[in-house]
Design a protein with these regions (language model features):
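Extracytoplasmic ligand-binding site segments that recognize negatively charged/polar headgroups
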Residues: 1-107
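Solvent-exposed loop/turn segments at secondary-structure junctions
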Residues: 16-17, 24-27, 44, 52-56, ...
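A bilobed periplasmic-binding-protein/Venus flytrap-type ligand-binding module shared by bacterial periplasmic
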Residues: 18-25, 60-64, 141-156, 172-175
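Periplasmic-binding protein-like
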Residues: 76-86, 125-149
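Paired acidic/hydrophobic, glycine-rich loop segments that form the ligand-binding mouth/hinge
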Residues: 92-93, 109-114, 130
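A ligand-binding cleft/hinge motif common to bilobed small-molecule-binding domains
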Residues: 112-128
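Mature extracytoplasmic/periplasmic domains
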Residues: 148-216
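Conserved C-terminal helix/tail region of periplasmic/extracytoplasmic solute-binding proteins
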Residues: 211-245
Length: 245
């Protein structure tokens, strides 16, 4: 990440947020639109990861806003209307652990606000869950490393960043046990495809075919960010109202 000519951090991993779903109940075709959240099969079984930014960003895309977070008053009204229309579908608002358990045991069959960073962990352990990026688009989170000013371990930090951005480090990072992620290094993709082709395929990181990078090029992915034309407190206050409705 650069500001003017100054490098502040180095991107190492990223991932997409879309429609997380139980594949025994909802197919990838079903999950190809956020409208699946209104499906009768989801009634009482729609979960929310309890953080307003990814959820309302997704609802903004579902409402037809061209930009998920840079929206005017009319666009913000549409976000609130679209979100409130789902309230009767919701089975709960969950923290990190609750999101895992409620998806794993089938308590929730669809989830908003998350992506493969959660469903991938479950899927690799045999759970029938997956994240599908819907036609309306998905969001991207990004993980980067910086070296803190005044650090006492500069050389160690520098060596870590050098390793994690190397092809081997990138391939290891993609399949991290805590949560899987996409990687930006083409050479890292090559190593991953050679050493762990199943995971490369699962994460749509196979070279020479339509893959995750094409979704970005096609404009289907937007960055998760702060609201531009509303205050953060406006989004947070609405989220609290939604939860209490």
């Amino acid at each position: 990440h650069w500001q003017d000519d100054t490098l502040y951090s180095v991107i190492t991993r990223f991932g997409f947020l879309g429609v997380a779903h139980n594949t025994d109940v909802l197919s990838e075709k079903d999950a190809a639109s956020y409208s699946v959240f209104s499906d009768a099969r989801v009634t009482g079984k729609l979960g929310h990861f309890d953080w307003h930014l990814p959820n309302l960003g997704q609802m903004s895309l579902a409402a037809g806003n061209g930009s998920a977070y840079d929206i005017d008053a009319a666009g913000w009204d549409k976000v609130q209307e679209t979100t409130m229309a789902l309230r009767g579908q919701v089975g709960g608002f969950f923290d990190y652990g609750g999101t895992f358990s409620s998806l794993n045991d089938g308590q929730m069959v669809a989830f908003a606000g998350i992506g493969d960073w959660i469903t991938g962990v479950l899927e690799k352990n045999g759970a029938k869950v997956r994240t599908t990026i819907p036609e309306e688009g998905g969001l991207q989170w990004t993980e980067s490393f910086s070296i803190g000013k005044g650090t006492q371990n500069y050389e160690m930090a520098r060596k870590w960043i050098q390793w994690i951005t190397s092809p081997e480090g990138q391939a290891k990072s993609a399949d991290m046990a805590a949560y899987p992620a996409l990687i930006p290094s083409k050479k890292g993709w090559e190593v991953l495809n050679a050493t762990n082709p199943a995971e490369a395929k699962r994460q749509n990181m196979v070279l020479g075919q339509h893959n995750a990078m094409d979704m970005i090029r096609e404009g289907r992915i937007q960055y998760r960010q702060l609201p531009v034309q509303q205050g953060l407190e406006d989004w947070n206050d609405f989220w609290s109202d939604y939860k209490g409705a």
